[in-house]
């Protein structure tokens, strides 16, 4: 007989087999079911020193587990015990051989995948002990792997995704409906083990190793986390989220956890299914595990990955119907807070994009929940560094306009206004609120006049402006209080402050509209917040024409916004002081601020209209935005010619319009008393004077519907009340007596009602306010005395200029004040005085070498706009400047005859006649000759020289005074083609020239002709 050859096992297989107890001792190895410690140490030592043998060990272990898993599900307890020991061996190998984990990664994942399929014999449920050990091995693998094989090795990647899918299914398992006695603890244990496995994948390098496979992984990880999160009560969510902020541990059931570091220093957490005698996990533990896993994943994301996670959140909510608005908002807020600081802006931005993609239809839960989520994020304490405030605002405003076009009373509009208002909660740069208001003003200016929803759009956007100021003011106060810089409360009687109304005087009549003074005890200063700059008056000035809109709801909404601006944003001016020793402002001189702005087009007066109708007239349309302008377009001051044709009684000023105007004027005299007196006193005198001359109704003139007599009386009430306030605040007894006498001469009750008290707490968007009409005047004519001013203007002026307080505030003597207050006032002159014109010949920069160098550079570029720079003239094309010099047309005064109206830039006004001026009204330049200038222009044209910004005369007619020669610019963009004004040429010629160019803006600025 031959000898049987000796077949010894390979060393790695022998070391592996030695780790198992003898077959007869397997059942007694419980409940720990651990491998033999000494032999396990030999195996790990062998594998560590011979990494090349790890692949063979993995293959052998894979064969054993495949057999053990199948037998364990069939009820063989020995194989189940052997399976548990095999999984413990695998975890030990993963932990000790972490540097060479890639050598047996494929076998490792197959072992884990097979183990997750083990079921309890005859019950069919998940074997938690086996799954727990498999999850522990998987967590060890995800902890130490670099993830380079995921996405490269197709077999490994497929197995890895299958494991994630199985964990995801276990994390959402429900055992409550599977039996008569639901086992909540068993369900919670199952979910916790599965969530532990998902947490391992979420914190692993493998999830971020492949850009292509990242979306596939989060498709398997995010939904189970969200399911468990949304199943929790809102109180549990808040409590567990607060715990996350204090404790970085992934879960109370995940032990031995350490923050991610170098592979050699990492530690993989261990798991257990249940310890005898220990109370089972609660639903709060499951919620905590889900939130911590989500927190761990989000903390490591970049902007692209965060955006993809938000998309999965939206997809999850789409699947579940957006039914839990409160939880939706909470999750959105927490997700934003957990994303790295520099990427947080992606959450509100992406949610707004989702809203923009929705169809315009009746609001659905998705509309309301998504919008509430954005608002919650913007109002939360979480900072959104990098948020594109203007871009987000543009999207929200576009959505508002779309919804209004869909339905004027759309249920989504209040939420949209609140969302826009929330942009004022956090300040990310100093001029943020200025930019928001400016953008809203721009969008209002873009609304075409043909838009049927124009008035409602303007009203809603105006509510957005008010909402932004309300939210910003509240946030400022909160920030100041947290810093301990509480704003001191002003006292009613501060030394040097204006005397409170009616102090030491007879009480006002009960019918006065000043029953509840709005600005009686304002804060001594406006915002001095360290967070931001207050809204600039130059920015707010762009919105002022909304006071003249034809729709009452727009006027009333804007009036409230203007009052709010004066209360919270307007910088307080110097306070008048009766004696130099008294308190108050340190500066006694009120210097008017002349800021650069955009000019308005002025035309000749509308017949029968007066300057008083800047308050009582109705507004017209706002022109569309012109992209050729580099500066923001102003809303033009407009008035409809509604004195004979009224579509509604509120097309002219109503009693509540006068109440709003009274409040605004009262606020101005409280906030900026010196400036308000200087600009307001001439206006009050002119309004009182012109009301008697212009607002006259004669029998048969067809103006019964314009409420002429009622408006005249309301104007006189307003003027008298404002003068009385001025007298109270400046301590001028003579004016107070005169105003009270005038009020006593008017029949009671007053036509101006008390101004409605604003809602408290503030409502961001309410229904449009309903106008109230005057009571029709029964008289068909008036006596000649009513055409005179109600107040004696000479007496008023005399008392005003003799006031020592006024003289001290202006630092002017009586004669200077007389010249200041006695000037002729008009709307156009007031507008001109409120801003600097870029093209004004009197407003040129001082000589500067840098400026002259820039001048030479610009002139060398054949830029004919010499008026824009200062310096020596260079050789250039004859242009409009030379012709204007020759014509003496550089006139910067505005006609003060009558009260010219402010026309729109709209094309409907282009057909109207432009203002004409007589030959005698022009200043002729003695040093220039119009004919010579025209010859030079024609000479350039004949030579074929093209002046890009010069003027080219097409034809000149010798004609009568009624004929004119048309001119056009040589600019291809057609700058200055509209709004041309007529100048006077040489004898027998009349030339129509462009208005002066506003060269900083690259467009013409309309200069009204002087009469």
Curated annotation (Swiss-Prot):
UniProt record, GO biological process: protein localization to plasma membrane
SUPFAM superfamilies: ARM repeat
UniProt xrefs under InterPro entries: ARM-type_fold (IPR016024), EFR3 (IPR039786), EFR3_HEAT-like_rpt (IPR049150)
Residue ranges, annotated region (Disordered): 478-510, 571-636, 892-927, 949-1011
Pfam families reported in the protein's UniProt record: EFR3
Positions with biased composition (Polar residues): 576-592, 609-625, 910-922
Composition-biased stretches (Pro residues): 489-501
Coiled coil: none
Superkingdom in the source lineage: Eukaryota
Family: Belongs to the EFR3 family.
Protein name: Protein EFR3
Organism: Cryptococcus neoformans var. neoformans serotype D (strain B-3501A) (Filobasidiella neoformans)
Name of the encoding gene: EFR3
